[in-house]
């Protein structure tokens, strides 16, 4: 109701269900890119579960180490189990070997030829993954591939693979976090609905925008020129929770030419002043409540209302 019919028809929008979907959108040519991208608040923080991306991580990790013929064969044999694609019968050892010996940028054509991908599908591997491969520490994944994969099957292979898959997923999640930090994408605006969910430092949402300790790195730090937080319940938050939500604005891209006119340090100083003022207000409120509770009827009986006030 705030715009004329048809006035917004030029805007392209889409929904990114996962980090992979989002990064694929960044591969689009500028004139084809969407103006608005909708995601859930858990899109970037949830476990990284894309099978083809994980397989590509195996391929890129292999480039960082020398492997024996037996170790390579173990990868060809067990990779579908690691990425939980054993039901795709076309993903055979032969196909995995073919992928492991090909540039990940050429995987789309191979997967189409092997009937594992529709011809009109996007490339399964966003360009950003191989682009930053030399800035990523692959040692955790290399260790799993070199030391943890079974050399042969056994009666308890399912139990063994479950444990190995856990190690593998942890390594992939670490690589994903590095990938997200190193990627050079930026956005002019982030609109975060239900922003009060960022009130606790150790939630996945909060850690996207702010550090809970000196050792942490917020994954979306420096990605947005402007940030707009929406919440219908700001005054239901405790004042410390409100301060923590406000501190999430620290993730703004302060180095851009459209950065705020004041510095990050100045903003942090103002937030600290607000925190001190809210602390003082809370103490004063508690003191007033205590003193008010100590008033007794006999203390007022000999005074007129005007005199009492």
Task: List where the protein language model places each region.
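Conserved catalytic network of the ASCE P-loop NTPase/AAA+ motor domain
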Residues: 29-31, 182-184, 219-223
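Coupling/switch/interface segments within P-loop NTPase motor domains and analogous charged loops
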Residues: 23-179, 308-309
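Residues immediately C-terminal
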Residues: 44, 197-200, 229, 236
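Conserved P-loop NTPase motor "coupling/switch" region that bridges the ATPase
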Residues: 189, 209-309
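Conserved nucleic-acid-binding Ia/Ib motif block in the N-terminal RecA-like helicase ATPase lobe
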Residues: 2-29
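Internal, charge-rich low-complexity segments
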Residues: 2-8, 45-94, 250-295
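SF2 helicase catalytic motif II
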Residues: 57-87, 185-217
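Nucleic acid-processing catalytic cores of prokaryotic defense/repair systems
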Residues: 1-3, 10, 35-38, 239, ...
């Amino acid at each position: 109701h705030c715009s004329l019919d048809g006035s917004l028809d030029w805007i392209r929008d889409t929904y990114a269900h996962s980090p992979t979907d989002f990064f694929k959108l960044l591969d689009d040519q500028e004139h084809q890119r969407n103006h608005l991208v909708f995601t859930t608040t858990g899109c970037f923080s949830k476990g990284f579960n894309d099978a083809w991306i994980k397989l590509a991580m195996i391929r890129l990790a292999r480039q960082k180490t020398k492997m024996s013929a037996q170790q390579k064969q173990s990868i060809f044999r067990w990779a579908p189990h690691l990425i939980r694609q054993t039901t795709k019968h076309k993903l055979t050892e032969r196909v995995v070997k073919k992928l492991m010996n090909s540039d990940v940028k050429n995987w789309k054509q191979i997967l189409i030829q092997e009937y594992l991908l529709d011809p009109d599908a996007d490339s399964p591997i966003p360009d950003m993954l191989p682009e930053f491969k030399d800035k990523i520490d692959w040692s955790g994944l290399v260790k799993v591939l070199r030391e943890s994969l079974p050399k042969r099957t056994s009666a308890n292979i399912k139990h063994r693979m479950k444990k190995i898959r856990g190690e593998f997923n942890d390594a992939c999640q670490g690589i994903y976090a590095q990938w997200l930090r190193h990627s050079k994408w930026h956005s002019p605006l982030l609109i975060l609905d239900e922003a009060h969910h960022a009130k606790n430092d150790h939630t996945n949402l909060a850690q996207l925008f702010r550090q809970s300790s000196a050792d942490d790195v917020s994954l979306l730090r420096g990605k947005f020129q402007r940030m707009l937080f929406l919440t219908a319940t700001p005054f239901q938050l405790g004042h410390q929770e409100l301060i923590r939500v406000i501190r999430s604005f620290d993730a703004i891209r302060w180095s851009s030419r459209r950065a705020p006119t004041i510095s990050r340090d100045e903003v942090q100083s103002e937030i600290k002043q607000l925190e001190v003022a809210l602390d003082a207000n809370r103490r004063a409120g508690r003191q007033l409540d205590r003193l008010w509770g100590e008033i007794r009827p006999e203390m007022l009986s000999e005074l007129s209302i005007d005199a009492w006030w």
